[in-house]
Regions:
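Redox- and metal-dependent alpha/beta enzyme cores, enriched for Fe-S-associated oxidoreductases
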Residues: 71, 82-83, 88-102, 109-110, ...
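Structural motif
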Residues: 76, 141-142, 371
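Glycine-rich, highly charged phosphate/nucleotide-binding loops
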Residues: 117-132, 348-362
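TerminUS-proximal long segments
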Residues: 356-427
Length: 427
């Protein structure tokens, strides 16, 4: 679609900076070609990922806007976090989408509103808005934020001057009393989405939405399970993009495509076919989430001769590992089930966060990882501080560990390559 249609009038109607957006698309397209299309022996079904990459700012945006115009969808609801329940948006015939936050943009403008020593992800979403180059932000009727880290919490105060904004209050402790608070917060969000979309959530609507998102999670779980094999049937780069796509693409289409990928990878496992030779050093990634087009670290690991076999992150297992209980019959029961499922996400914002350490070690064992690469974006205090606990858990489990602090720029690629190559040689 992107190659057959001129999308510039659509982007212009969204108030975007066309020249800068063209420059961004050119850079991301070049990056995608250099990183993804140069991989050897990719599964044929990853052609879906090429489709996503080609249409991410064009065909998908047109599809969403066309659905709104045709009355098939009510509102486009953007978010930056896996704690925002997409089931609620779908139950109101809305379209949930993840928003741009994976590259540096308009940094000079951003630093007129946010401190220079703010994490790259936060500066990125502010920059994409101020630079008018993200069609997901521009097409969103509502942006749902969440007070996870302090940086986001305060940045949303600025972002609310730019977009229609609603911020969820997420507890920072896992216990029975905070779960009660969180359930009430989820119900407040449901009321807000109902009001924005002009649709009343019924048991039938919510049950269908829960099932649809659970099916997406099941497909991602199925694909992830194949990565325990040696040789790995699919690269870490392609696996990362499947989850990144899950934030943006149409849910039924993505679910079908991921199931196709999983089926092909299952066949590859049976045949002993992989994207890297048997015995390639296997890496578990853990740490900060990676939004499109932040593929730098996975590319470096796999170009250095390793293979990423799992991601303990919000653009990895935390997104899909738990399902919502589908046994509820009333809206309240189902909203409680949604809240309970999302409350299991072990973000570094929680204290204490012992379950995350257990998850990391268990994933490393289940996926037969040879080492753990723990990553924090620069100035991300939460993941930087929690890295010490991750290192201790890895050491106690006898799993080699390295911690990396990086940002979205490419200037540190050489240094990171040297560190990654040295780490792979030691395991």
């Amino acid at each position: 679609m992107a190659e057959e249609f001129d999308f510039h009038p659509m982007w212009e109607s969204l108030g975007m900076n066309l020249a800068d957006h063209d420059m961004l698309l050119g850079a991301v397209g070049q990056m995608y070609g250099d990183m993804f299309l140069t991989q050897n022996n990719r599964p044929k079904s990853t052609s879906y990922l090429d489709f996503v990459a080609t249409n991410i700012h064009s065909g998908r945006i047109k599809e969403m806007l066309d659905k709104k115009e045709a009355g098939e969808a009510t509102k486009i609801v953007g978010s930056f976090c896996v704690y925002v329940p997409e089931e609620i948006v779908l139950a109101c015939d809305g379209i949930p989408v993840g928003l741009c936050s994976g590259a540096d943009w308009a940094t000079d403008k951003v630093e007129e509103h946010l401190p220079r020593n703010t994490c790259p992800l936060i500066k990125s979403f502010a920059g994409f808005k101020l630079g008018e180059v993200c069609p997901y932000i521009e097409s969103s009727d509502l942006v749902v934020g969440e007070n996870t880290c302090d940086g986001k919490k305060k940045a949303y105060e600025f972002f609310a001057t730019q977009k229609n904004m609603y911020v969820m209050d997420i507890p920072n402790v896992h216990d029975e009393s905070t779960l009660v608070t969180w359930k009430a917060e989820v119900k407040k969000l449901a009321a807000k989405i109902e009001d924005e979309c002009g649709v009343k959530i019924t048991p039938e609507r919510l049950k269908a939405a829960i099932h649809a998102v659970n099916e997406k999670r099941r497909a991602l779980q199925r694909l992830a399970a194949t990565r325990a094999a040696d040789p790995a049937p699919i690269s870490g780069l392609d696996s990362l993009l499947t989850v990144q796509a899950a934030f943006m693409d149409d849910t039924p289409r993505l679910t079908g495509a991921i199931n196709d990928m999983a089926a092909e990878c299952e066949q590859r496992v049976e045949a002993g076919e992989g994207v890297a030779p048997k015995g390639t050093k296997r890496i578990l990634y853990t740490g900060t989430p990676m939004a499109v087009p932040n593929w730098k670290l996975f590319n470096l690991i796999e170009k250095a001769g390793g293979i990423v076999v799992g991601e303990e992150s919000c653009t990895g297992s935390r997104y899909y590992k738990d399902l919502v209980d589908e046994s509820g019959e009333t809206v309240d029961e189902m909203l409680d089930a949604i809240a309970e499922r999302y409350f299991k996400i072990n973000c570094a914002v929680f204290t204490p966060n012992d379950q995350r350490m257990k998850d990391i070690v268990q994933m490393a064992k289940d996926l037969h990882a040879d080492g753990i690469v723990d990553v924090a974006l620069q100035f991300c205090t939460l993941y930087e501080m929690e890295s010490f606990a991750v290192e201790k858990a890895a050491e106690e489990a006898g799993i080699p560990f390295v911690h990396i602090t990086t940002d979205y720029a490419g200037e540190d690629a050489g240094q990171l390559q040297t560190r990654i190559e040295a780490f792979l040689e030691t395991i």
